[in-house]
Design a protein with these regions (language model features):
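Active-site anion/phosphate-binding pocket segments in diverse small-molecule metabolic enzymes
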Residues: 2-15, 19, 69-70, 89, ...
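Active-site-proximal beta-alpha core segment in soluble small-molecule metabolic enzymes
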Residues: 2-5, 10-12, 17-20, 31-204
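Conserved PLP-enzyme active-site core in the AAT-like
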Residues: 28
Length: 385
């Protein structure tokens, strides 16, 4: 029994693997390209503070989040780093952003004027990166003449410092031709702005898959996200790089019972036992990360043996067919990670639904405690906050 547990279902994060992943990414991009670590949604629900501490110790200076609230949490812990909010920030939050030296994404001349006025009132310079829509059709200035004129006007605002300009790939692996076109649209537009006197310290468009498969698109800065944590949302990984998943998800057996042939298991009597079955119950369910669509599809590891989940996954519990496997209440079960010679990968789980690794990870519920290990020793828990 692990004496640090506060719940019999939990996540373990390997900080050594995370550190190795960050070193590998730095090796991929080289010394001339700045690495902006994407830690939005609390580092994809894996813990922005403990993971960013590792990155800061490795010399990484730039971080990206989705919202100002995420940026302010980071700023409280890391007063010296540079933090970019990738998404929209409402005008009423401009003052907090300026006072805390948060870099904002801008794609509106009107917003820029309001931001400039607020910075002037505070006797500060507002820091911004300009977003360009090169084909994602999400946010950003379009690449038209009017946009160039508006961006030039933003450059002329005295209390705004335009540090960077960026765009985002829509289909980096699945549509390389469209990706190339996006890159060309973006860089051509930036070159045209430069001819108008608008120069940028950082140009960035490369995301995780671009970093892996298209180093020619790195420019001055890259924004790796999911690959930092050892996952790719891809069927392929370049052999020269060693990225490892940092997550293990485990639970303890809560119940063991013998169910007779012909009897049923779970809600709606969804599973009918075709033989006498040893049914193990685990204390986690769809409120923790495993949606019902995965019912009767996933496997878990019990004492090194693969065992099938049976019945409908419940909100807080799921049942497992452990027939023929020696086990006891309290035994550790692996739902993601390694046990003995077997391994359950997040990608395996995602193959049973339309989900991707990025999406699956961000469904890890806050009630699952997270424990962080370095050199196989527990060094931090989100319960210490």
């Amino acid at each position: 029994m692990k004496d640090f547990l506060t719940r019999p279902a939990w996540i373990e994060i390997d900080l050594d693997k995370f550190e190795n992943n960050m070193k590998e990414i730095k090796k991929m991009i080289g010394e001339k390209t700045e690495l902006m670590s994407v830690v939005k949604s609390d580092s994809y629900r894996l813990g922005a503070i403990p993971l960013s501490k590792v990155s800061v110790d490795l010399g990484i200076k730039y971080f990206a989040v989705a919202t100002l609230s995420e940026a302010l949490i980071l700023r409280k812990e890391f007063p010296e780093i540079n933090i970019l909010v990738l998404g929209y920030t409402p005008e009423n939050l401009f003052e907090d952003a300026i006072k805390n030296h948060i870099i904002l994404t801008i794609y509106s001349l009107d917003d820029s004027r309001v931001l400039n006025k607020k910075a002037e009132e505070l006797n500060e310079k507002a820091l911004v990166h300009i977003a360009i829509d090169s084909g994602m059709s999400r946010i950003g200035f379009t690449t038209c003449e009017e946009s160039k004129d508006q961006i030039k006007e933003i450059f002329d605002l005295k209390n705004i410092y335009v540090e960077g300009i960026f765009s985002h790939f829509a289909a980096c692996e699945s549509d390389p031709e469209f990706t190339k076109r996006q890159f060309e649209v973006f860089t051509s537009f930036v070159d045209e702005l430069k001819e108008m006197g608008c120069s940028f310290k950082y140009r960035h468009i490369a995301n995780s898959l671009s970093v892996l498969f298209h180093p020619e698109y790195n420019l001055d800065m890259v924004r790796p996200g999911i690959i930092q944590y050892g996952y790719t949302d891809s069927d392929h990984l370049p052999e020269e790089y060693s990225l490892e998943g940092i997550v293990s998800l485990k639970a303890q057996i809560a119940s063991i019972r013998e169910v007779k042939k012909g009897e049923t298991v779970g809600y709606e009597r969804f599973h009918k036992c075709e033989k006498d079955t040893k049914v193990v119950t685990l204390p986690l369910g769809y409120a923790d990360a495993f949606p019902r669509i995965l019912s009767e599809k996933i496997e878990v590891l019990i004492n090194g043996k693969r065992c099938k989940q049976i019945g409908l996954i419940c909100m807080d519990q799921m049942m497992i067919d452990a027939t023929g496997v020696d086990c006891e209440i309290g035994d550790e079960v692996v739902l993601i990670g390694k046990q003995a010679d077997e391994e359950i990968k997040i990608r395996d789980i995602c193959s049973y639904s339309s989900d991707c690794e990025t999406s699956f990870i961000t469904h890890f519920h806050g009630r699952l405690p997270k424990y962080y290990f370095k050199d196989k020793k527990l060094v931090y828990s989100n319960e210490m906050d």
